[in-house]
Amino acid sequence: MPVSWTLLIVLAMAAAGFAIGRSRVLAAAGGDSRRLHSRTSYYGWNIALFTAVPALFLIAIWLFAQPQANRWVLGAAALVLAAMGLFWTLGRTTPQFRARIAVEGFVRGLLIMCSMIAILTTAGIVFSMLFETGHFFRQYPWQEFFFGTTWSPRFGGGSQLGILPLLWGTLYISFIALAVSIPIGLFAAIYMSEYASPRLRGIAKPLIEVLAGIPTIVYGLFALVTVGPALRDYFAQPLGLGSSGSSVMTAGLVMGIMLIPFVSSLSDDIINAVPQSLRDGALGLGSTKSETVRNVVLPAALPGIVGAILLAASRAIGETMIVVLGAGAAARMDLNPFEAMTTITVKIVSQLTGDTDFAAPETLVAFALGLTLFVITLGLNVVALYVVRKYREQYE
């Protein structure tokens, strides 16, 4: 039996159970819904949930564990489980049954299960990286990885896998991107929320948010074809700082443009959420519009603004395509923003692609790089949480 047929039959049984349960309990109460413990819809939902959810859960687990299993056996098992749930719940559907409590408990259990899936998925990702990183450090000294200044993987042996050049490129490009996106995005949000007319805001905000929907590969091509050559011809070559269109500045500027809608849109929503009474109180005490924004609105909106900046920073650190096309693939430590560099994410991709030995340290280093990115992102979250709590306490 095809899985689609099984799903349709299970859902049909649940729908039938919903209708039968409602009519049956209402008939048992003599047509008087006031004699029921719960509303009639709860009795129907109780039957539908206990009929469909266990069977659907069985199908999902079975297909995940045994994708090639016999579909007729799977369908029969799911239908038997659905029928058991249907008849069991019908048997206890009486006017005195606390259907609302049962349904709410069932839904609460589903929510807990979904939360556990998210938590266990995160834990699984972390433990998988830790496991593979452990294999890597058993083959390559951790001192040379964390403090090495040369990145030169050779699958034939003699590799130098120092992370510092990659970390420097990641932070350098991210810094330039944030230096572009944070001021522009934040000032745009302040203008749209505090100074712009509703008509202008309705036009400007969607136009800015269009940038968020552009694929990163398009930004990368924009960096490769337009921004890179322009920076090379008008800045790098005249100043004697380089002759390549691929550079840290190219990737940072284009990435900053990409991050503007993240900072702007989120900050705008947070600033608009500040109660109008705070603005009215500040204006009533004689503050100007700019003083109200600076001393009242922004401190109140600071937690959300920090969250927007954190989101932009995480996106910048994890970006790959713009760096590949805009900054090149050279792993070096240099202060010149017009030199080609690379980032951790680019090297993760390069080390895991191609016909490589998965047990070799040159491949396993990708997991160590990924774990490093995870730790950096976690550190950003901790710092942001500290800043939010500090300023929120001062404001309160």
List the predicted regions and their residue ranges.
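Cytoplasmic-entry segments and transmembrane alpha-helices of multi-pass inner-membrane transporters
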Residues: 39, 46, 100-113, 184-223, ...
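Periplasmic/extracellular loop-to-transmembrane helix junction in inner-membrane transport proteins
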Residues: 65-77, 90-113, 129-177, 197, ...
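Membrane-interfacial helix termini and adjacent extracytoplasmic/periplasmic loops
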Residues: 131-164, 219-256, 328
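Membrane-cytosol interface at the C-terminal ends of specific transmembrane alpha-helices
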Residues: 178-180, 186-192, 198, 202, ...
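Transmembrane alpha-helices
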Residues: 206, 210-211, 266, 271, ...
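Non-cytoplasmic
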Residues: 221, 229-233, 304-343, 350
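Interhelical loop and adjacent transmembrane-helix boundary motif
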Residues: 238, 323-374
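C-terminal transmembrane helix and the adjacent membrane-cytosol boundary/short C-terminal tail
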Residues: 269-272, 276, 283, 310, ...
